[in-house]
Amino acid sequence: VTETAATGRALPHPDREHIRLESVLHALSDPMRLQIVRELAAKEAELTCSQFDLPVTKSTTTHHFRVLRESGVVRQVYRGTAKMNGLRRDDLESLFPGLLDSILAAADRQAARLGDAARVPVGG
């Protein structure tokens, strides 16, 4: 499935029925991508890529968002020139009940145990 905005640009996303558990777990296994998902879950809103203050290059940031999108964890759509990112919570909950909340809770416990050094702040 692709999303096309007025700009005519489209981004591929897996349909709900094509989201695979191993792809979701792989996407969430990277600390940077997990932090992106934690921030999206905390904000409960769409955020632009530039709102994430990640300590990596733009190309690496793009890679992380692509992995999250292609795994079905996030949906990216263009709104004008901005690429908006939203968590596909409903799709993930439908396919893997409780998985996302369990992972987010475990990540919160780990961040508390390891301190703020384990947290990647988001700008915004």
Language model regions located:
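Conserved acidic functional residues
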Residues: 30, 64, 97
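Generic signature of intrinsically disordered, low-complexity, basic-rich segments
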Residues: 1-3, 23, 58, 67, ...
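Canonical helix-turn-helix DNA-binding module
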Residues: 50-76
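Low-complexity, charged, repeat-rich alpha-helical/coil interaction segments
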Residues: 16, 34-35, 62, 75, ...
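A general structural signal for short secondary-structure boundary/capping elements
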Residues: 69-74, 83-86, 102
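Amphipathic alpha-helical dimerization/coiled-coil segments
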Residues: 2-20, 38, 42-43, 89-124
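N-terminal helix-turn-helix DNA-binding core of bacterial DNA-binding proteins
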Residues: 22-57, 79-91
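N-proximal short alpha-helices
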Residues: 5-10, 25, 34, 38-41, ...
